[in-house]
Amino acid sequence: MSAKAVSELSGKEVLYKYFEPSGLLSAPHAFHVKAGENFDEIANKYEWLARDNKGVIKPDQLIKRRGKLGLVKIGTPQELKAWFEKTGDSYVRVGQTEGRLHTFIVEPFCAHTEKDEMYIAIYSERFRDVIMFYEQGGVDIGDVEEKARTVSVPVQLNENAMTPSDEELTTLLGPLKDSDIVRRFVVELYKAYKDLHFTYLEINPFVLLNNQIHVLDLAARLDETANFLCADKWKSRLTPYGGPNHVEFPAPFGRDLTSEEQYISEMDAKTGASLKLTILNRKGRVWTMVAGGGASVVFTDTVCDLGGASELANYGEYSGDPSESQTYEYAKTLLSVMTEGTPRPDGKVLIIGGSIANFTNVAKTFGGIVRAFETFVSKLKEHKVTIFVRRGGPNYQEGLRRIKDAATKLELPIHVFGPETHMTAIVGAALGVKPMPTVPTAPQTTGQFLLSPERNTGGTERAPPSPAANATPTEHPLTTAQQNKLKSFRGLFEDDTKAIIWGQQAKAIQGMLDFDYVCRRSSPSVVASTYPFTGDNKQKYYFGQKEILIPAYKSMAKAFATHPDASIMVTFASMRSVFETVLEALEFPQIKVIAIIAEGVPENQTRKLLKIAHDRGVTLVGPATVGGIKPGCFKIGNTGGMMDNILASKLYRPGSVAYVSRSGGMSNELNNIISQNTNGVYEGIAIGGDRYPGSTYTDHVIRYQNDDRVKMIVLLGEVGGVEEYKIVDLLKQKKVTKPLVAWCIGTCADHITSEVQFGHAGASANALGETAACKNAALRASGALVPESFDDLGNKIRQTYDELVSQQIIVPQPEVPPPAVPMDYAWARELGLIRKPASFMTSICDERGEELNYAGVPITKVLESDMGIGGVLGLLWFQKRLPPHANKFIEICLMLTADHGPAVSGAHNTIVCARAGKDLISSLTSGLLTIGDRFGGALDGAARQFSEAFDQGWSANQFVSEMRKKGKHIMGIGHRVKSINNPDKRVEILKRFAMDKKEFAQETPLFEYALEVEKITTAKKPNLILNVDGAIAILFVDILRHSGMFTKQEAEETIEIGSLNGLFVLGRSIGFIGHYLDQSRLKQGLYRHPWDDISYIMPESNLVKF
């Protein structure tokens, strides 16, 4: 939802902060007190209340007409406290809604008379803002719409030009026209309204006292999508009293947010997906979990239309391609509420529904739902929950298979249906008022791209199949003569339409090209893409089996200049950048259509784009849309879903029925219903779910009326707004004469007493005429063909089509099979349709899921267990969860080997390379390349020699003797500087750690054996001590053999593949990097070795022959 009501305190604070520099507003420090809180403790922080001044207290919970309801108290601090303690936590009824009073605003009382009270309101419409003013305000103002004077301010790109003129202000203020302060206040208030992205602001009353305006009562809505623009402006003033520093958007009165609703709301705020949950009746029998904004409304409508309103437990949706874990959390939260309390004797039903998805991977989301079933399986059985599932879209077969497998494995009663079944057919079965739907024959895999049209989702008997195609393709659905006659009429999209795509959207572009190919277009519809964050390049795509290159441009201007025949731009820009992107695109006169996919575009920005596009004759589709499709010609982005759905819905060739809808998911459902009950879709547009879509129902219905290729129109409206009434007027005026089948979703709103925001930003009725029921009645009365419910929509479309066929207005043509479209390799692999040997294998790390895994351990568990870097190394190097003493040993080794001064070869090389001006990686690798048998590479050798001697049963004396006989140096023994008299502190640390059996809790036989060897070698020469390489290597072998974590074979393999040397390389890399950074800080110049430190030994001249 974009326009959200704010608390009175938040609304006032936002205005007080904005007006602070001007001093025009009196800005007292009001505060909230909530039921159960200590009134005195909070009130004592506010000096104005501590002085026994009068104050005002009233609920701040979006309640209208509080004065008339007796919910305003004026009095001393003690009187306010007494009223608060009496009223807090009490229940009151406002209209049809009963709710608890829990949050109150307390502010200073402004003494005045009724004649001082004035009224002002500002609200936004599609192409204008309206300012209403009346010099008499307060609770008894009466019908303000009749009394108030108004000024309209047209939307313009330049906001500074959007201000009422002096003449308009004079007319607006009436008897107060000479009041300079009131005049300034109106001008500044409207400026604040625009800058702060209000969508509605009403102050009733405000008074003028002592040359300042006092705002006594306020109601407002802010455009929540403008948060990225206004986050700082929406913060309250800095005060010594504390209080919230952010805007509060309270739940509607009568609907306190439950902990579950709050949790889902917080999840929704952190993801690009849409997650909504409203609990209507915790003890209800009928629960829904529906994918898609429009579909969620349709399912709720159907429950209510079939008599289940009193049992409806919740409203909600999950859409926008949520991840498996997000779907799991959503489902788990829903099931936790559904299965709480005492089980009902008649059990409960859970309806998991949705329209046919455009791009959401159904199997992925259903994986999360199955996990939730597994978590709550005992509770689901205890509460006798019966589950009904209906879904379609990408990979839906795999998703439905997972649900069926879960039903068998968990022994749960789950009835599963795909897009072969009408979307809401499962609702009647779930409520027990209709028989269980039959399951028609359906394709079994998404891989069957040339699908036989056996799918019937229209809720009607199947239409007889079209005659078999002749060898010679027949024009469809018009004859050649008819087509020639209509060549002069061009719609938004034709079979030669070309588009430029804004954004890095390879998948969407490939989908458009596949659609072009299956429609038998002679050339691709996408001629270029543009994205300002990459350089000019060419990107590879497929047009059928053929590889093609499509240019990508950094500059949009260059893209359109290079491709003057491109008339459409599809922009995938985010809500933050879409305004500037579309504004730039509108500068190019060749553009006729711009499709805006992004959700969350601020309404003020959208309205400016609408204004400019309208003035320049450009059609906008969106924002918040999947786009549109014209079978046989063109599709926008991901419209129509996967290729299997496009083929099943016969979207590869034109039909005779055009439709317009708000919802992208529901447009896919309409594609199915129309294709199974008529000769197919001619064109379909999803205008988007925002309050101000770029183009309207009326725009497209008029286009369809004027296009003789369209024989029948379908309109899917919804609750909220008045756009459908324009269609009513067109019908009455006979400006639309073609058969119009219409249905407005959202009839459930009449059955829900508390305010609920449905799937789309514009789906909320603010007046009786905006309800779906009123719209449906008006459409029916004006001559539209309106079904009894959405369940009956397919029947109504079929009946209308049959009449047109009988009148020969539509003449069905033979079907021509589409060309085979190759399936994308990545998608085919995901579906399990193909396999090939992997080029790489890994067993230590997996980043593909929701969370990084180290050897199967989620990264969150790694951090929570506090295993340290030693534990991480154990997972990544050995695929083991090592014991604590082993983790600590690894960390000690890394610290001990981190550096040994600049004189050693590795550090020296790193320093020389750094001083030559090389980068970090080059300098580091130059140092690492010196590591070998002579420098740092003794760990593996020491481990191997000592292990072999110990395993053969040699004594320490025998081992030393055997090595001397072979003339081999004992790896890990000896040091150039250190000796028995000047021991290596690093080795001493390791010895103490290994001998402390409380900390190093395991046997160390090899290390003890090495100490015996050291006694023998140091007796011969003091510097033949066990060095740090040897100590590390031998102790590590003990860990491998005696920690209980490794088999003998694993221990030997670990030594053999060089793991021990890895410890030295990893540790010493720390020091090498330190040397590089040190040299860079010191800014040392190029190193050149001095001549006097080099012995030049040249051959005698008489020995060199030329």
Swiss-Prot record:
Chain positions recorded as Mg(2+) binding sites: E718
CDD domains noted in UniProt: CCL_ACL-C
Cellular compartments annotated: Cytoplasm
Keyword Nucleus (UniProt): no
Catalyzed reactions: oxaloacetate + acetyl-CoA + ADP + phosphate = citrate + ATP + CoA
GO-annotated biological processes: acetyl-CoA biosynthetic process; citrate metabolic process; fatty acid biosynthetic process
Region Disordered: start-end pairs: 442-478
InterPro entries associated with the record: ATP-citrate_synthase, Cit_synth/succinyl-CoA_lig_AS, Citrate-bd, Citrate_synth-like_lrg_a-sub, Citrate_synth-like_sm_a-sub, Citrate_synth_N, Citrate_synthase, Citrate_synthase_sf
Any GO molecular function: metal ion binding
Active-site positions on this chain: H760
Residues noted as binding ATP in the record, renumbered to the chain: 701-721, 752-778
EC number: 2.3.3.8
Binding annotation for CoA: L779, R780, A781, S782, G783, A784, L785, V786, P787, E788, S789
Binding-site residues, citrate: N358, T360, R391
Family, similarity comment: In the N-terminal section; belongs to the succinate/malate CoA ligase beta subunit family.
Record PROSITE patterns: SUCCINYL_COA_LIG_1 (PS01216), SUCCINYL_COA_LIG_2 (PS00399), SUCCINYL_COA_LIG_3 (PS01217)
Organism, as annotated: Caenorhabditis elegans
Name listed for the protein in its UniProt record: Probable ATP-citrate synthase
One GO cellular component, as annotated: cytosol
UniProt cross-references to SUPFAM superfamilies, sorted A to Z: Citrate synthase, Glutathione synthetase ATP-binding domain-like, NAD(P)-binding Rossmann-fold domains, Succinyl-CoA synthetase domains
Gene3D superfamilies in UniProt: 3.30.470.110, Citrate Synthase, domain 1 (1.10.580.10), Cytochrome P450-Terp, domain 2 (1.10.230.10), NAD(P)-binding Rossmann-like Domain (3.40.50.720), Succinyl-CoA synthetase domains (3.40.50.261)
